[in-house]
Amino acid sequence: MAPTELPVREMKLSDGIVTLSPLRLDDVEAHLSGEDELLVRYLNGGPGTREDVEAYVRHCREQWEAAGPLRAFGIRVGVDEVLAGTIDLRFEGERLSPGQVNVAYGLYPSWRGRGLATRAVVLVCGYAASEGGLEAVIQVEPENRGSAAVARRAGFAPGRQRLSTDGARLDRYVRNLRSALSE
């Protein structure tokens, strides 16, 4: 299921506290500054370099413009929309059934513990539902208790444990997206 094409520059989701908008090249420095051991371990797969992060942001922009299966948002806070982290939706991917959408997120250290990731997940679930997603899936390594807590607070229920293609155990959390349209 491919999402519909949206104007990249105009895309914003907000609940009045958190604003989600597509990643852009001027986010690269803030992302590199905010990256820590937890983001590297659980989300990024390795420390970012300027070249790698710029290439990823360009890829994300191309996905938005081509209505591809990836939707990568910056999690922004405050009037100035300071970058606090990222959240990605994948409408296709490893071990996803038709209609399922993978949600992956991470906050920079100074923004953790404020409920921002939960708000971002709720916002992105509404967007995924509006794009035809039927069920959201969050895949978390068992020792990543913070991400599991975000999933539960955002209305996800524990699903079956799975193995990733590299053999890592992942706890799956799932949420029916029908109710997300009304949030």
Summary of predicted features, one role per range:
Residues 1-110, 127, 131, 157-160, ...:
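GNAT-family acyltransferases
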Residues 37, 139, 154:
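Residues lining the SAM
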Residues 86, 118, 140:
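Ser/Thr-centric signal marking residues that sit
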Residues 105, 113-130, 145-153:
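Conserved acetyl-CoA-binding loop-helix of GNAT-fold acetyltransferases
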Residues 107, 141-142:
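Short amphipathic helical patch at the helix-1/turn junction of helix-turn-helix
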Residues 131-140:
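Conserved GNAT acetyl-CoA-binding A-motif
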Residues 142-143, 165:
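Conserved beta-strand edge residues that scaffold enzyme active sites
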